[in-house]
């Protein structure tokens, strides 16, 4: 069975409660989670600072994250206070680019939007950002943390290439896409945190690749409902699986084996990232909080024997805020 195969591979360090309580935890972790700033509180503080009738770009970014990337929204609340605004700006920028592909009916329109963002980034570095909320916040982050333009443009370039509705030819091609998008975003996040460390960069590279692979898996049910399949073709061919098998939501063993191989690659990247843990500065850990949701998905898909269409995989994890807080408190990733 595929499940037993993954179980035989040495996994990352245990995530259970036994390891957690070797240090004294807070008496009520849920109480700490409840103290996290809610969007309504942020909205009130923003309104007080901005004055009546003045739209706030930071609030816009938070709303965008809350609606479109809730996991990143929660993670941003656990950043150091002086970095939260810039971190949410980066994630909102990523959301703006990610939703272009699904929001346009013609590739030409998508290319125009990507060109808008490419010019916006160039203008930010000339202190002339467009009057668009995410662009304004990103410009402030660029100024505050001296962010690297190359990483921002690399994300745009790779997202633009991905406007074509084509499956990845290989798992390596998917990893390249993830490196140029998710890993680049993490390099920028490390700059926001003031971390310049080669081990942190290596961890970011692997976590970004794991993020890209898991995102591809998680989106498969949605894409198949639109008669699209983006899973790596080389893995599908290896197991004799066609795109039509995924469109029909086939649950045969060879289909599960495709999912197993792809999920195992994400698992391996997480394992590699954690091998640097002792050498990564603790200041970098907030950038890597997303490993909580990545590991949660990989564990869930293992429990359902790699049935990528199982309903439980589409359910939100109500304990995610608590899990993120505990991981942040433990200073682990």
From Swiss-Prot:
Gene Ontology cellular-component terms listed: mitochondrial inner membrane; mitochondrion
Location relative to the cell: Mitochondrion inner membrane
InterPro entries in alphabetical order: Isoprenoid_synthase_dom_sf (IPR008949), Squ/phyt_synthse (IPR002060)
Source superkingdom: Eukaryota
The entry's keywords: Membrane, Mitochondrion, Mitochondrion inner membrane, Transit peptide
A Pfam cross-reference name: SQS_PSY
Gene3D superfamilies in alphabetical order: Farnesyl Diphosphate Synthase
Transit peptide extent on chain: 1-44
Residues spanning the membrane: none
BP GO annotations: biosynthetic process; mitochondrial respiratory chain complex I assembly
Family: Belongs to the NDUFAF6 family.
Its job: Involved in the assembly of mitochondrial NADH:ubiquinone oxidoreductase complex (complex I) at early stages. May play a role in the biogenesis of complex I subunit MT-ND1.
Protein name per its UniProtKB record: NADH dehydrogenase (ubiquinone) complex I, assembly factor 6
Lineage: Eukaryota, Metazoa, Chordata, Craniata, Vertebrata
């Amino acid at each position: 069975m595929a499940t037993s195969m993954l179980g035989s591979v040495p996994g990352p360090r245990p995530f259970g409660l036994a390891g957690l309580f070797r240090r004294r935890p807070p008496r009520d972790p849920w109480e700490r989670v409840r103290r996290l700033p809610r969007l309504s509180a942020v909205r009130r503080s923003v309104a007080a600072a901005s004055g009546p009738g003045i739209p706030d770009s930071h609030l816009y970014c938070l709303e965008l994250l809350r609606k479109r990337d809730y996991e990143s929204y929660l993670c941003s609340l656990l950043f150091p206070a002086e970095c939260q605004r810039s971190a949410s700006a980066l994630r909102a920028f990523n959301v703006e680019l990610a939703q272009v592909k699904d929001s346009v009916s013609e590739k030409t329109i998508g290319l125009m939007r990507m060109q808008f963002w490419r010019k916006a980034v160039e203008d930010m570095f000339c202190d002339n950002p467009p009057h668009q909320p995410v662009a304004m916040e990103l410009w402030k982050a660029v100024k505050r943390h001296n962010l690297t333009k190359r990483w921002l443009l690399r994300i745009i370039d790779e997202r633009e290439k991905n406007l074509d509705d084509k499956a990845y030819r290989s798992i390596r091609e998917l990893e390249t896409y993830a490196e140029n998008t998710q890993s680049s975003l993490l390099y920028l996040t490390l700059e926001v945190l003031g971390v310049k460390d080669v081990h942190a960069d290596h961890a970011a590279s692997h976590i970004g690749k794991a993020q890209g692979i898991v995102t591809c898996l998680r989106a498969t049910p949605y894409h198949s409902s639109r008669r699209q399949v983006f899973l790596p073709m080389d893995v599908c061919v290896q197991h004799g699986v066609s795109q039509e098998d995924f469109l029909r939501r086939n649950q045969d063993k060879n289909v599960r084996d495709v999912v197993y191989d792809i999920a195992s690659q994400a698992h391996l990247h997480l394992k590699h990232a954690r091998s640097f843990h002792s050498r990564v500065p603790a200041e970098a850990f907030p950038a890597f909080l997303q490993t909580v949701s990545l590991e949660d998905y990989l564990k869930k898909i293992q429990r359902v024997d790699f049935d990528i269409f199982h309903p439980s995989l589409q359910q939100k994890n109500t304990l995610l805020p608590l899990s993120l807080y505990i991981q942040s408190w433990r200073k682990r990733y």
